[in-house]
């Protein structure tokens, strides 16, 4: 009986062993046939020691082919700890530390690790790497230390357009600005150096290295003009320092015909070749004592592109939107005499909103005069006639209710009340540019729309992508959207803006020989902060606009005050004076004409005025439908004593 049980147990064990063998064979077959490729790749990876070769990042050019960012040759130092003899590890670590000026303990830790490869340093200057090569040669070290080609980003103009261009990290990845936005185009494809090693990562005999070259990244052509950017940055820095602008400033110059950003400056800027070095001397002195969070916050603020990332109340510059909508809706016209009357304020929803010149009201005004005087009550009244629904449709069409989509990271959106929450008082304040916030790029785009015969054009910073291998250029076409206002309305608004510069609050932006239009603005930076934002928005030449400019200065505290006409307009004037000739925009033929002072026509009849103007080689422009030559003139544009060219038309209004 016991014998039979033993035989039975043996039989069962044999069956189990047979089943296990069958399962093992099935498993081996599955590994060989189904997973063979995978394990082969894993084995090859384990036996091959790969070192990366950085791709040369694409060049960034300005619109005229000037290099703004490029990749200079440098080298990367790596070590293979398993290929460095134990007795030489300390010597190697000390010498590398000495040559590369890196902490000895950190290098020793890497050299003594049980690993096949360790990165010691990237972007090493040729001078240092050649010194290391020479030492290796003199000490017969032919393995364990690798010196491979690498690239280092270099910015020839240092601080120029720093917040636009951006910068790269240690792995050549774009971290900010255009470098980040177009990283996929610029970065190229990495190469590699491969060598077969044993299980411990040591070289096997004289096996040759396998080299796969890196592929360069594509190049970019920006819309920025280096020379215009330099002019703009020069005057922005001067303005911020002279006017003691505690929170800096920004300037945008845009071509209204195609959306090209010719210049976009933020002050203060920073050195692109040292992007992690703070640009503030006070902060620099306490930098080492600051927390990591505080350091990061200050660096983020330094890198911030105010022109697209900051919002502000535009103030009176926004009256251009109200004027455009009013003209487009046929609510008013530019020169209807006595259409409006400023009494120093206006009652809205039980609240009296004052004109800035409440102490000496403007009195009888046309729309042109109201814009020249920057009279709040007139624009409040126009806003009431337009109505919330229609006004918000214009905000939408002008692009204020969404981001512009400009091709750079970090763009902020505007801050408006929801349409349903806008009451009479809220509409009133919107009408003259307060109690909401927009970005500078939205404002520049708005004026570009007006200057582009009323058609919206999207702002852009990149004109073309150039293939680094074939040099084929892929142009990026301008993007046009809706017709916001008619060409007729566009001409009227531009014409009124010219009056603002020739005789109104924007006089300080005037440049002899050029027809320039503009609008000044001043607003509080927040509620009851005691801080102000001052701005000037302008366009030239009026008859064929080639450039739109927006100057925005944050909290000027200097002796010049904080009014847009006194602080921001002069900056625009200096820039117009240099940029317009640079763009080959010739001065008006009138520059060669004789100049005369406008005579005083007030108190005279139209008939008498015609005679006086004829004697001075000037002409007269009457109110529409005016035929009575005996009427007395009560107001004239330009005012008396203003210098103009012969044949200029003088606008007159009667009582």
Where does each model-flagged region fall?
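Beta-lactam-recognizing serine transpeptidase/beta-lactamase-like catalytic domain environment
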Residues: 67-69, 198-211, 257-317, 321-553
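Short secondary-structure junction motifs
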Residues: 142-144, 246-249, 335-337, 403, ...
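Glycine-centered C-terminal helix-capping/turn motifs at helix ends
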Residues: 187, 332-333, 603
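Conserved helix-loop functional segments at active or binding sites
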Residues: 238-242, 295-296, 499-502, 581, ...
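Ligand-recognition elements built from short beta-strands and adjacent flexible loops
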Residues: 513, 551-655
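A short, glycine/Asx- and small/polar-enriched loop/turn
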Residues: 158-160, 256-258, 349-352, 629-635, ...
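Acidic/histidine-enriched alpha-helical segments
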Residues: 106-116, 152, 245-258, 341-347, ...
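Periplasmic/cell-envelope proteins involved in peptidoglycan metabolism and beta-lactam response
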Residues: 1-283, 311, 389-397, 509-511, ...
């Amino acid at each position: 009986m016991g014998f039979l049980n033993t035989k039975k147990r043996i039989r069962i064990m044999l069956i189990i062993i047979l089943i296990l063998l069958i399962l093992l064979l099935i498993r081996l077959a599955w590994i060989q046939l189904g997973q063979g490729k995978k394990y082969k790749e894993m084995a090859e990876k384990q036996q091959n020691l790969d070192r990366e070769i950085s791709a040369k990042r694409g060049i960034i050019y300005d619109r005229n082919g000037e290099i703004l960012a490029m990749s200079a040759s440098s080298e990367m130092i790596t070590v293979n700890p398993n290929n460095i003899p134990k007795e030489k590890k300390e010597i190697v670590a000390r010498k590398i530390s000495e040559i590369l000026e890196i902490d000895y303990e950190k290098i020793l830790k890497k050299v003594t690790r049980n690993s096949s490869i360790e990165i010691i340093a990237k972007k090493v200057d040729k001078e240092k790497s050649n010194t290391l090569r020479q030492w290796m040669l003199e000490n017969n070290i032919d393995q364990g230390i690798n010196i491979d080609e690498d690239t280092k980003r270099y910015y020839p103009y240092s601080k120029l357009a720093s917040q636009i261009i951006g910068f790269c990290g240690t792995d050549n990845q774009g971290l900010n600005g255009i470098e980040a936005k177009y990283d996929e185009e610029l970065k190229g494809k990495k190469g590699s150096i491969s060598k077969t090693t044993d299980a411990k990562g040591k070289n096997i005999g004289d096996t040759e290295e396998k080299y796969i070259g890196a592929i360069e990244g594509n190049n970019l052509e920006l819309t920025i003009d280096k020379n215009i950017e330099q002019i703009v940055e020069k005057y922005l820095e001067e303005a911020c320092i002279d006017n003691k602008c505690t929170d800096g400033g920004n300037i945008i110059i845009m071509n209204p015909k195609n959306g090209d950003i010719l210049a976009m400056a933020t002050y203060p800027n920073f050195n692109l070749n040292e992007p992690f070095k703070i640009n503030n001397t006070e902060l620099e002195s306490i930098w080492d004592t600051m927390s990591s969070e505080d350091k990061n916050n200050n660096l983020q603020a330094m890198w911030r592109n105010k022109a697209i990332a900051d919002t502000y109340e535009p103030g009176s510059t926004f009256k251009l939107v109200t004027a455009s909508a009013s003209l487009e809706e046929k609510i008013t016209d530019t020169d209807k005499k006595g259409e409006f009357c400023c009494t120093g304020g206006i009652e809205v929803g039980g609240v009296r909103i004052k004109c800035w010149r409440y102490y000496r009201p403007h009195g009888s005004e046309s729309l042109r005069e109201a814009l020249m005087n920057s009279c709040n009550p007139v624009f409040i009244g126009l806003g009431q006639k337009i109505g919330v629904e229609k006004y918000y449709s214009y905000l939408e069409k002008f692009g204020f209710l969404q981001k512009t989509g400009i091709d750079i990271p970090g763009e902020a959106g505007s801050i408006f009340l929801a349409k349903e929450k806008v009451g009479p008082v809220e509409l009133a304040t919107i009408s003259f540019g307060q109690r909401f916030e927009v970005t500078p790029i939205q404002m520049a785009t708005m004026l570009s729309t007006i200057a582009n015969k009323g058609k919206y054009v999207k702002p852009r910073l990149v004109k073309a992508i150039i293939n680094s291998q074939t040099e084929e250029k892929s142009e990026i076409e301008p993007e046009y959207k809706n017709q916001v206002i008619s060409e007729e309305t566009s001409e009227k608004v531009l014409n009124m803006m010219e009056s603002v510069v020739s005789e109104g609050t924007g006089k300080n932006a005037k440049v002899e020989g050029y027809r320039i239009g503009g609008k000044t603005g001043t607003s509080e930076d927040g509620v009851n902060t005691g801080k102000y934002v001052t701005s000037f928005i302008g366009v030239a030449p009026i008859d064929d606009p080639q450039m739109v400019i927006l100057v925005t200065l944050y909290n000027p505290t200097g002796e010049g005050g904080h009014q847009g006409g006194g602080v921001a307009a002069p900056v625009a004037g200096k820039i117009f004076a240099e940029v317009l000739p640079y763009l080959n925009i010739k001065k008006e033929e009138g520059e060669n004409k004789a100049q005369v002072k406008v005579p005083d026509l007030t108190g005279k009849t139209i008939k008498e005025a015609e005679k006086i103007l004829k004697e001075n080689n000037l002409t007269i422009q009457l109110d529409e439908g005016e035929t009575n030559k005996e009427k007395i003139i009560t107001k004239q544009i330009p005012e008396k004593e203003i210098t103009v060219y012969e044949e200029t038309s003088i606008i007159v209004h009667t009582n």
